[in-house]
Amino acid sequence: MPSAPSTPPSKRKSKFAGFGKFFKPWKWRKRKSSDSFRETSEVLERKISMRKPREELVKRGLLVEVPEEDVSIPSESPPLRNGHMSVEHANPPEDIGGLKRKTRQDSTGSRPKSGETTVQPCATAEVAPVEPCTATEVASVQPHATAEVAPIQPLATAEVSPVQHCATAEVAPVQPRPVSEVASVQPCPVSEVVPVHPRHLSEKNSEKYRPMSEVAPGASRPTSEVAPLQKVSRDFSKQPLLPPKRPLSSSSSVTQESVLGGQKPDPSTRQQSSVPVPTPRTIHPLPFSKQPPVPPPKPQNRSSNPLMAELSLALGGSTLSPAGSRPSPPIPPKRVVVPSTDAVNNKEKALRPASLPPIPANEISIPSPPSPPISSHIPVSNPPVPMLTLAPPNTEVEKEQSASPLPLHIRIQQALNSPQPLPLLDSSQRAQSLLFMQNEVPSEEGTRVRSLPVTIELLKVPDDDDDDNSLEDESLSPESSESHPSRVYIGDVPSVTVIPNYLPTCVQEEEEEEEEGVSDTDSEGPVLYREDDEEEEEEETSSLANKVKRKDTLAMKLSGRMGPHDSNPEFPQRSREEWNQIRQQIGSQLNRRLSQRPSAEELEQRNILQKNEADRLAEKKEIKRRLTRKLSQRPTVAELVERKILRFNEYVEVTDAHDYDRRADKPWTRLTPADKAAIRKELNEFKSTEMAVHEESKHFTRFHRP
């Protein structure tokens, strides 16, 4: 058959052709979206629309706005303890990679031997001379070349105790200088540096550290030479700096200038050689991203400070040591004669110098106004110089320390600056540390007059227990300090000075402009919500709570927020039109949200809204009433049977039966023949009426014989 091969085999009917109906290939049809899915999406959309947008939260002050660009200097560095800045906030992370390399070299490389101290580079900008020096001065004081040149190298290994290599990582990078300049400066000989191992400290305390009273006042430079530094600190008012915490810093920076007098200025300073150059921010702790926490500093090597070494050189071998391990809170750049470098203060902060034993906290008190770089503090135009006096100390070495007063020119300057003293205090009323209270409720104090006295805490070997105890003491101090907010001891007899902080409007505007440029960002970027009860007195907390509070960035940021009673920048004064506009905006938002709300019926249908009890009872009553009406109008079963409405299989008769013995083979349980006949008759009748049947076949329908 020729036509057979041409026929396609698919047309043949197979015996499984019917299976195609059941096993069809899967076709993707657009499925109708289910009701539950649609309802869920509506609920989610409604919830999302009810959320407040971020801008609104920021406007209402519940969220702090974090700007997009990463500003390197945080506007607010919450102080941890008496004026310390936290590691995360103190400095911008500039060249972390290079710094890590240097740190690794430093930790693996040279550690200071017992007799000598290697002074590593500090900062570039320190090289600038403040006054012209003659060649003889340059010859007499050899320049500390390495100490001020290398671009981003960490601090002196002498300043970092062998246990404490993490501290090296906290040095802030400075702008690198050309290699030619670095090479041209000659290194500092070891002979100029004071040996600083604790071993030697204990042995040579009596010889090395003479009190400053034994040093002639001419040993440190007179006020006329110090004067150019006012412009220096004014230039630096734009940087967050931690100003002098002790009288040491004033004389130390003076000596630093004298030592640095012969140095070659770096390129930035050559341009403005006529103007004195700012003393640099040499070190701030640098926030490292992935670095273990810094171990607590060990008591060794604590005064090994290049500036301290220079100071000892300039003062003819007598070395001053910082009075107290915990510096008081920051003082703004002075327009008066208190030159200082942050380098000194930061080094002392990070490394806890302990060249002299502790001074009790209640014997030293220093007035210090709030600092400018932190946004919640307001700068001060012309505050008096910090003054320090020592009451009779306990140990012999403390007596040595207490015998060293301020240099004469600084005391004269203090006397000129401070107003006339008020009546004397009894010695029990000492200036308490307002530090923690101030940070709990700092306020944007326009041009108000306020002052912040602060005690310098004990200088101890920083064990954890000591830290916690001193923190608790500080946190308990505000009650007594509130009663005497502006008292300070000057000289041997405690007298009182009032330190007014009058704020000129021009300075205030400048600082506000600077603060606007500075961001609130934190290394972790916590979401900051307002606390309404910030101003309440903080209760006594455990040492663990104090530790957590020190480390918790969110708590630190919240502690720096403004109290609600202050003139809050987040809620500025608005005109009536602005308020009306805001009300209209809120009203339209509320209307939109109300229109999106589901109705009560919707919610009831979805079992979200439960009816209240009264409604439920009323509904039950209504149902009962309807049922009873229906039942009362129903005809009885007998009536329905009579009217042939109900048939045999359509009803069940309910009879009341007495309890009886259901066991079989009782004569009264057996059906009598009459009962059986009645049953048969009924069944036959039922069957005969069930279907129409021909007469001749009717006998087939009999169910039982009659």
UniProtKB/Swiss-Prot annotation:
GO terms for molecular function: actin binding; protein phosphatase 1 binding; protein phosphatase activator activity. PROSITE patterns: RPEL (PS51073). It is found in: Cytoplasm; Cell projection, Lamellipodium. Residues 290-299 have a biased composition (Pro residues). Residues 463-476, 508-523, 531-541 have a biased composition (Acidic residues). One of its GO terms (biological process) is actin cytoskeleton organization. Residues 106-121, 266-276 have a biased composition (Polar residues). Residues 200-211, 563-579 have a biased composition (Basic and acidic residues). InterPro entries: RPEL_repeat (IPR004018). Keywords: Actin-binding, Cell projection, Cytoplasm, Developmental protein, Neurogenesis, Repeat. Pfam families: RPEL. Regulator of protein phosphatase 1 (PP1) required for neural tube and optic fissure closure, and enteric neural crest cell (ENCCs) migration during development. Acts as an activator of PP1. During neural tube closure, localizes to the ventral neural tube and activates PP1, leading to down-regulate cell proliferation within cranial neural tissue and the neural retina. Also acts as a regulator of migration of enteric neural crest cells (ENCCs) by activating PP1, leading to repression of the integrin signaling through the rho/rock pathway. Belongs to the phosphatase and actin regulator family. Binds ppp1ca and actin. This is Phosphatase and actin regulator 4. The lineage of its organism: Eukaryota, Metazoa, Chordata, Craniata, Vertebrata.
